[in-house]
Curated annotation (Swiss-Prot):
Transmembrane segments: none annotated. It comes from Mycolicibacterium smegmatis (strain ATCC 700084 / mc(2)155) (Mycobacterium smegmatis). It holds the Pfam family dTDP_sugar_isom. SUPFAM superfamilies: RmlC-like cupins. This is dTDP-4-dehydrorhamnose 3,5-epimerase. GO terms for molecular function: dTDP-4-dehydrorhamnose 3,5-epimerase activity. The gene is rmlC. Pathway: Carbohydrate biosynthesis; dTDP-L-rhamnose biosynthesis. Homodimer.
Length: 201
């Protein structure tokens, strides 16, 4: 597999090697060695999730408080999603900016979203199925959302956007910052550095 860091520090697009024959397809979508090589630390998986979405479903922008937040390693095993990472780390050089990757069941790419970053995706096909590896269990009291239409994200056109009440009524980035719920660049950098020190030790 190969990894390409996105324009948002701490986010990577991972492209696997696809091996096909008369039986079908095989590929490695995650390896500990491959992850450690690009991230500089191991991925401590604590939970695995699966979501199935109709075309037009928009989930996000979601994030968790740091520490420990919740890093995510995400792939799409059926259909296609426009997967977005948003920099919500106050003090970051790219604060308020976004980048995106197409995840689908053809190229089989994944995206890694490190602690403190915001995550969202738009389902482009019915029954789009997304698998997440998560570095921390779901903790609703530490989970937050920011309005997904607040970042100038160039969402692909779909007949109708479908959002949960929580996401549709989420605060703007400015409102979330004023409420003091956004992570800081310094806290995120410090947390990731502890993960890297643990690898060395």
């Amino acid at each position: 597999m190969t990894a390409r860091e996105l324009s948002i520090a701490g986010a990577w697009e991972i492209t696997p090697v696809l091996r096909t024959d008369s039986r079908g397809l095989f590929f490695e979508w995650f390896t500990d060695a491959g992850f450690t090589e690009f991230a500089g630390h191991q991925f401590d998986m604590r939970q695995a999730n699966c979501s199935v979405s109709a075309r037009g479903v928009l989930r996000g922008v979601h994030f968790a408080q740091v520490p420990p937040s919740q890093a995510k390693y995400v792939t799409c095993v059926r259909g296609a999603v426009f997967d977005v990472v948003v920099d919500i780390r106050v003090g970051s050089p790219t604060f308020g900016q976004w980048d995106a990757v197409l995840l689908d069941d053809k190229d089989r790419r994944s995206i890694y979203i490190s602690e403190g970053l915001g995550h969202a995706f738009l389902a482009l096909d019915d029954d789009s199925t997304v698998m997440y590896l998560c570095s921390a269990p779901y903790a609703p009291q530490r989970e937050h959302t920011v309005r997904p239409t607040d970042f100038g994200i160039e969402w692909p056109e779909v007949p109708e956007l479908i959002l949960s009440d929580r996401d549709a009524q989420a605060p703007s980035l400015a409102e979330a910052q004023a409420a003091g719920v956004l992570p800081t660049w310094a806290d995120c950098q410090a947390f990731v550095e502890t993960l890297r020190r643990n690898l060395v030790s």
